[in-house]
Amino acid sequence: MAEICYEVVTDACPSSVYESTPAHSRRRPRFQTVMHEDWEKNCKRSKQEALATRYSSIPRSSREDFSDQNVDVSSPRYGVSSVCGRRREMEDAVAIHPSFSSPKNSEFPQHYFGVYDGHGCSHVAARCRERLHKLVQEELSSDMEDEEEWKTTMERSFTRMDKEVVSWGDSVVTANCKCDLQTPACDSVGSTAVVSVITPDKIVVANCGDSRAVLCRNGKPVPLSTDHKPDRPDELDRIEGAGGRVIYWDCPRVLGVLAMSRAIGDNYLKPYVSCEPEVTITDRRDDDCLILASDGLWDVVSNETACSVARMCLRGGGRRQDNEDPAISDKACTEASVLLTKLALARNSSDNVSVVVIDLRR
């Protein structure tokens, strides 16, 4: 994954021209691209292993005719961009796991995508990136056609993730972590989680917090999640019913602290802040793409604009060719994700911005 880090050039950094002018002596932004080799290697290896497993599961007698079948079992194209933006620290995390699970009664794999927006520190978001897809995989049953089964699976996975984070937090504090200044350590650390499991015929989205999933269908946005804000009427009733309060402090906050009503972690705000996700199951039709992103994007870019940008990039990139390597992240999706993060920064987003664009065209 290429991460664009936002940093500040000080007087100690060399400048090309006009160093002495007042306008150029001020602190100014500079963008630096950093390639995460481990991310690239892990993604490529996981895709190659998944493809090898999928191919080996096909009976030998039918392998020769596999390319002539009309069913596309390849992993969907995707693009990822994660930027630090104007924040001092990067607290977002992204998880991409193509073909992370194959139901026993089907040869077609399922694909996992997730965006986690941490707050207080990066511990919980990082832990979700490492563990949540594994918990979902463990909770999946052989037959997931029933919507209630999907909802139960996601709810159990998020609950297990939350319990892991609470019990695991005490052991992750390091000398360089700002959690050192908190007592008890990491109790005020949490993360949003918006994840999607894509099957050949369904799009399953589970959301906890104010990250968002938006489907672009026939050029129009279809929100697949609803932000969990403390002033949302049903969330306000739930918080007050549990004995909590929503206090306005530059925006509605739970007990005047947290600007979202659901999250993984945040042990000190329980039970007012819930880890229970809202789950939607959508049948795949004439879909263009799915966008998962943290609120660093959605705070300044509307659903309509995001879909227009992504669709424009996808239409310019064309469709996957028969001889194209499906294990390579698609250039058009990557361009869409990068363009969306640049747009968010151009509109003065003050948060980390993480965007995943998944091509759903058949």
Swiss-Prot record:
Presence of keyword Metal-binding: yes
EC number(s) per UniProt? 3.1.3.16
Question: Any idea which positions bind Mn(2+) 2?
Answer: D117, D295, D351
Matching Gene3D superfamilies: PPM-type phosphatase domain
Give the PPM-type phosphatase domain ranges: 77-360
Pfam families given in the database record: PP2C
Query: Which residues does the annotation say bind Mn(2+) 1?
Result: D117, G118
What this protein needs as a cofactor is: Mg(2+); Mn(2+)
**Cofactor binding note from Swiss-Prot or TrEMBL:** Binds 2 magnesium or manganese ions per subunit.
Q: So what does this thing catalyse?
A: O-phospho-L-seryl-[protein] + H2O = L-seryl-[protein] + phosphate; O-phospho-L-threonyl-[protein] + H2O = L-threonyl-[protein] + phosphate
Keywords associated with the record: Hydrolase, Magnesium, Manganese, Metal-binding, Protein phosphatase
Q: Which PROSITE patterns match?
A: PPM_1, PPM_2
Q: Which GO terms describe its molecular function?
A: metal ion binding; protein serine/threonine phosphatase activity
Query: Under which main EC class is this enzyme filed?
Result: hydrolase
Q: Which family does it belong to?
A: Belongs to the PP2C family.
What is the protein named?
Probable protein phosphatase 2C 24
What is the organism field in this record?
Arabidopsis thaliana
